[in-house]
């Protein structure tokens, strides 16, 4: 585990809804990149027995928060980026017991950023795609 991953785990453990209630784990962090994991349980399912959209969105939201603030973690600065808006496309369901969210940075500017968060199962099957725009808190 890298020191950046460890630092992100320490900082974002305070995102208690994502980490304690939902059970999301921070797996890997690099500059502008985060990978988070969610082991699926019955509590993550909707009335139809499918994965609840909110569980997938929470997974993507935490991955975005970590990736967009990764440079702050590297430089030991306070967190500076928050979500301004997101869209989610549900691409399919999975029978797998693990969801993985991985970020890709589209733009990391001085006042706004855009990230795609790809959610797939542990076998690589695409489950959702989230696009999130963030804003720097100084703006």
Task: Describe these PLM feature segments.
Residues 1-139:
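Terminal targeting signals and extreme-terminal segments of soluble enzymes
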């Amino acid at each position: 585990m890298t020191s950046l991953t460890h630092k992100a785990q320490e900082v974002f453990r305070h995102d208690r809804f994502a980490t304690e209630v939902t059970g999301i784990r921070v797996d890997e962090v690099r500059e502008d990149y985060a990978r988070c994991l969610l082991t699926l349980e019955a509590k993550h399912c909707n009335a139809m027995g499918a994965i609840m959209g909110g569980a997938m969105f929470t997974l993507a939201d935490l991955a975005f928060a970590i990736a967009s603030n990764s440079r702050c973690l590297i430089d030991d600065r306070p967190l500076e980026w928050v979500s301004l808006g997101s869209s989610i496309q549900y691409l399919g369901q999975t029978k797998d017991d693990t969801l993985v969210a991985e970020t890709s940075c589209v733009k990391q500017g001085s006042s706004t950023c855009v990230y795609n968060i790809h959610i797939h199962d542990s076998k690589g099957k695409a489950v959702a795609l989230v696009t999130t725009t963030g804003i720097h808190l100084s703006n």
